[in-house]
């Protein structure tokens, strides 16, 4: 069959409807979003919560969000740039830091809802699959669905580290084990020890040790911030273990410092009076005559 040119008629253009702006920009998957925010009609005004996980080049964003007609509202948020308060000063976007950010979000949210003592999550991190169970005659666990946005949901992806941290922190998020680091697709089993190693940054420590012995220049280049902060491979597991304890002890956000603006002068100059204008002109003339 020969080439047939597609002729777009006047009717085509008059009936053409553009896609949503964020779809045109490649920012939102609206099929996914529709499934995540559509609530059962018999639940009326009950919000449907999403655990939003986003990984950027320099930060990890974890939020619990619910939607209304006017837009999205953030119930609680935690960020990887808060982790230095808990002792994690470098590697803020690796797998272990993603887990810690998810844990921070969960403990902060449950403290806000006064459920922190009732649902403590998995206090012993062993890498096994954990789901929060409801307590009889008490409020049910806080439930949220994972929202990964446009991220690829491959096995070992860091968005699932945020999920694991939130679940171990006490939030109920429906999930399986197939996407965690350490899952074997052939045997269809999760190696809990491997996942635990990722949660405590052992994969980073082993790579640091490897580069130290094989390529000193690459080690100094890749792990320059670790060297600057005095973090050795043997210290990493302890750093994350202490961070988990510190997060559980006090997950509240840092208090904002109030800045005083009283001493700052306004950039808007007040209008000169006629007397001031004449005096200014006279001073300019006098200085000009003095230079002659």
Curated annotation (Swiss-Prot):
GO terms for molecular function: 5S rRNA binding; structural constituent of ribosome. Its main location: cytoplasm. It comes from the Eukaryota. Keywords: Cytoplasm, Nucleus, Ribonucleoprotein, Ribosomal protein, RNA-binding, rRNA-binding. The keyword Lipid biosynthesis does not apply. InterPro entries: Rbsml_uL18_euk, Ribosomal_uL18_C_euk. One of its GO terms (cellular component) is extracellular matrix. Pfam families: Ribosomal_L18_c, Ribosomal_L5e. GO terms for biological process: ribosomal large subunit assembly; translation. It is found in: Cytoplasm; Nucleus. Coiled coil: none annotated. Component of the ribosome, a large ribonucleoprotein complex responsible for the synthesis of proteins in the cell. The small ribosomal subunit (SSU) binds messenger RNAs (mRNAs) and translates the encoded message by selecting cognate aminoacyl-transfer RNA (tRNA) molecules. The large subunit (LSU) contains the ribosomal catalytic site termed the peptidyl transferase center (PTC), which catalyzes the formation of peptide bonds, thereby polymerizing the amino acids delivered by tRNAs into a polypeptide chain. Component of the large ribosomal subunit (LSU). Belongs to the universal ribosomal protein uL18 family. HAMAP family: Ribosomal_uL18_A (MF_01337_A). This is Large ribosomal subunit protein uL18. It comes from Dictyostelium discoideum. The lineage of its organism: Eukaryota, Amoebozoa, Evosea, Eumycetozoa, Dictyostelia.
């Amino acid at each position: 069959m020969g080439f047939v040119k597609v002729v777009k008629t006047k009717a085509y253009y008059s009936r053409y409807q553009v896609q949503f702006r964020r779809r045109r920009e490649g920012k939102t998957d609206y099929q996914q979003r529709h499934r995540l925010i559509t609530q059962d009609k018999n639940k009326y005004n009950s919000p449907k919560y999403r655990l939003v996980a986003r990984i950027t080049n320099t930060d990890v964003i974890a939020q619990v969000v619910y939607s209304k007609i006017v837009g999205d509202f953030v119930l609680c948020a935690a960020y990887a740039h808060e982790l230095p308060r808990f002792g994690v000063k470098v590697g803020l976007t690796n797998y272990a830091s993603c887990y810690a950010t998810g844990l921070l979000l969960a403990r902060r949210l449950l403290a806000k809802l006064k459920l922190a003592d009732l649902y403590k999550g998995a206090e012993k991190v062993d890498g096994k699959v954990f789901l929060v169970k409801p307590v009889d005659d008490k409020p049910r666990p806080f439930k949220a669905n994972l929202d990964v946005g446009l991220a690829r949901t491959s096995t070992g992806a860091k968005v699932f580290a945020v999920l694991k941290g939130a679940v171990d922190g006490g939030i109920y998020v429906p999930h399986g084990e197939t996407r965690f680091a350490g899952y074997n697709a052939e045997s269809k089993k999760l190696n809990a020890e491997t996942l635990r190693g990722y949660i405590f940054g052992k994969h980073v420590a082993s790579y640091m040790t490897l580069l130290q012995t094989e390529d000193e220049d690459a080690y100094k280049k890749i792990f320059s911030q670790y060297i600057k902060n005095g973090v050795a491979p043997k210290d990493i597991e302890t750093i994350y273990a202490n961070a988990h304890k510190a997060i559980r002890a006090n997950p509240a956000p840092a208090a904002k410092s109030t800045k005083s603006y009283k001493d700052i002068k306004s950039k808007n100059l007040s209008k000169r009076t006629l007397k001031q204008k004449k005096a200014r002109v006279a001073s300019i003339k006098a200085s000009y005559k003095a230079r002659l």
